[in-house]
Structure formats: C-alpha cells, structure tokens
C-alpha cells in the first residue's frame, strides 16, 4: 500500500510539473527552460533510478576495485577509503544523472547516458573534489567541475574505442558505445558531452577569475597540449620496435593522453577551492605523478590480466604494437616504477593539513593497487 501511495504521489507531481512546463515553455528563456526540464527529470530519475544505480553498480564496481587501501601501507598510512570513495561516487553519479536528462534528440542523450552512467571508478571527479577540499574549499563549489571532467573523460573513451582509433568492443564490462548505438551516434554523443562539459563547468558558483582559469585548464588538457597530442603520438608509435623508441617517447604519450586530464581535474579543484599559487603548484605536481602512475598500472594490467578481470579487451596494446612500459622496460621494472611514483606523489603533498591530505594519499594507493 505504501508503495502504491508513493507511486501515486510521484505521478501527481510529474503531471503537475508537466502541466506547468507545457504552459510556460514558450515564455521561458533557454536557460530557465533547461532548468525546468531538469526539474521535470528529478522525480523520475534522481531519487529512485540514480540512487539505485549509485548503490548497486558503483558499489559493486568499487568493491571489486578497492584493495589494500583500508589497511596500513608501507608508510604506516591508514584511511578508511572505501566509504569515502563510494560516498563521493554516489554524489557524482546523482549530479551526472540530473545533468543529462532523456530529452530530444533522444538517441543522442541515450548514448550519452549509456556511456557516462555505465559504472566506472570516478577517479577524476573524486580527485577534483578532494583537491578542492584539500585547500579549504567546499564540495558543493566543485561538483559542476567534477562532472565536467568526467564528461570529458567519457568523451575520450567513446572516441578511443572507435574502429579508427583503438577499435575496442568492451568498456567497463559492457559493449562500447559505438557497438550499441552505431559509430555516427557515438561520435555525436561524444561531441555533445564535450560541449556539455564546458557549459556545466560555467554553472559553478565561483568568481569569474577562477572560472576563466578553470576553463583554460580544462581546454588545454584535451587539446594539442594534452589528450589529443598524446593520442596522436600513441597512434604514430604503433608497430615501432623497442630500439626505435625511448622512455621519453613513452612518457610523452602517457603524460599527455592520460595524465593531462587527471592533472586538470586536480588543478581545477584547487583553483575553485581557493588555493594559493604555491598550493595549486603542489597539487599540479602531485597530479602529474598519479597521472603517470595510472597509466603505468594500466600497462601492467593489460599485460597480466584477462578481459574478464579488466572489463575490457586484454592484451590489445600488445597486439596493436603500442608503446607500453612492460614492452620498453619489462613488467618487474614497471612495478618498481609504480612504487617510485607513489613515493614522489606523497612528497608533493607535504605541508598540507594532515587530515585533508588522507583521501589523496588513499587515492594514490587505490590507483597503484587496483586490479582493473
């Protein structure tokens, strides 16, 4: 009976809001129309569907990803990271769900939602929120920025999986976006996520000075000084023999293709949180370390894990002849490099509040110890 009452209540609310929307639609500005559409979206999607998604898919995904971070590491550090990460991921998932309603063009929005709500560790948006709080800011100030970097990241995955790029059929254990919706819709949905990311970022409640800097950081991270440069170098290096390349080539690819957006995520969080120039620079150097760390671990996993364990096609880098750390220096030396990057990352966090720094240290351990 209680469930029926809840259903009737939601139905009444929805019909009432729908009447208001259809009555006022022609009289509203585009910005207010968009807000009203999102309001109509909330009763059906956010409290029910998004909450169920956040508790089920995200928890299951993180349960299988988080290992060792709740125990003491080699430095004697201990932090209960799992509830922290799940809480942040749920906040981000709800915000993403509200940001991308099921409206026309329906097939594009379905593809956008399929790609971005398909699970995932949410490392970049969590890094953005943690960096904001590290320098004394509030989570609410950085939530739009956190969503923006995840939209950009998802766009990059859609493009990366296309037949003309890495030609992958699996992502997060599910068929890739172009396999479900077709290449043309996948490309359009990626472009839509890119545009929406900047639109969403500009809705953050911060000063124009901080906003301009945040937009610049994000744009730089995905252009020819960031992600695009790394992807171009990655593609041009396919099939080269080990003697034809060096560590500097490999580091260039990883720092730009993977590290640039991780760096931007942290820096934008610190900027929005009101960090000093010295604090922002320390956060930037920390993020550069974990950006490279993330990709080195990715290279190791691609070499040592199965497709079932990874949730994506295993061994594809080796088959494609891509440059990876195991290919250039071997698996064991790659693991040693992981430990060095962990130490370097921690050093850049010295001088910050000991409690506020804990999530970032735990995130570093999570990235290093993840199994997919």
Curated annotation (Swiss-Prot):
Pathway: Isoprenoid biosynthesis; farnesyl diphosphate biosynthesis; farnesyl diphosphate from geranyl diphosphate and isopentenyl diphosphate: step 1/1; Isoprenoid biosynthesis; geranyl diphosphate biosynthesis; geranyl diphosphate from dimethylallyl diphosphate and isopentenyl diphosphate: step 1/1; Isoprenoid biosynthesis; geranylgeranyl diphosphate biosynthesis; geranylgeranyl diphosphate from farnesyl diphosphate and isopentenyl diphosphate: step 1/1. Keywords: Carotenoid biosynthesis, Endoplasmic reticulum, Isoprene biosynthesis, Magnesium, Metal-binding, Signal, Transferase. Binds 2 Mg(2+) ions per subunit. Pfam families: polyprenyl_synt. NCBIfam families: FPPsyn. PANTHER family: FARNESYL DIPHOSPHATE SYNTHASE, GERANYLGERANYL PYROPHOSPHATE SYNTHASE 4. Dimethylallyl diphosphate binds at residues 171, 257-258, 295, 312, 322. It comes from Arabidopsis thaliana. Residues 1-22 form the signal peptide. Its cofactor is Mg(2+). This is Geranylgeranyl pyrophosphate synthase 4. Belongs to the FPP/GGPP synthase family. It is found in: Endoplasmic reticulum. One of its GO terms (cellular component) is endoplasmic reticulum. GO terms for molecular function: (2E,6E)-farnesyl diphosphate synthase activity; dimethylallyltranstransferase activity; geranylgeranyl diphosphate synthase activity; metal ion binding. Catalyzes the trans-addition of the three molecules of isopentenyl diphosphate (IPP) onto dimethylallyl diphosphate (DMAPP) to form geranylgeranyl diphosphate.
